[in-house]
Amino acid sequence: MIKLSIINGSPKLKNSNSDFFIKELTSNMSSDISIKKFYVREILKDKTLLKGIIESDKLLIASPLYADSFPSVTLKFLEVFGEFLKENNHPQIEVYAMVNCGFFEGKQNKTALNIIEHFCNRNNLTWKFGLGIGGGEFFPNSSKTPETMATNKSLYSSLKSLRESIENNTSKENILLNPDKMSASIYRLSANMGWYISSFNKTHKIPNLRKKIY
């Protein structure tokens, strides 16, 4: 039995994009994988949870991208976890990362993945590889059956590679991806339309979207 701890770095405690990608990754995972899930906000409130994490064989850190890095709560977690690792004996845990961003291009996540790799090197953890998911807002809202959509082929192929690595201990280079069969301009257009749709749903008037607060 392989013990896998999953750290959700989203500031949200539910319905985040990170939640979605974790669910899609683990839904078809082998029964030989024992999974424990943690939220960084909960860990920072109860640091005894860190003991359960270092008892794992593998660790996955899933987080949104905030300006080439991570949310402040995730950065704080890395700081606290790093200190905990220095003070406690731990096995050679293998680490993966899954970072999603609102930008269309998956390459925007490259720096964040490098941060996790450097964290591993500094704290005697084994870095495996990570997924950098562009268009992160698109995938959770794309369909009730997103795995069948042509735009999502790269995502589900990459999730499969990550799943197989966790199950079979294979290694790969970082995978940077974005929606298939979609241009960046179409992505931006659909994202902007989302604001208008949200405005209608909340009975706000469209002109209010263009108002300035200064």
Spans of model-derived segments:
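Glycine-rich phosphate/pyrophosphate-binding loop and the adjoining helix
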Residues: 29, 131-214
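N-terminal beta1-alpha1-beta2 submodule of the flavodoxin-like/Rossmannoid cofactor-binding fold
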Residues: 1-91, 171-172, 177-180, 197-214
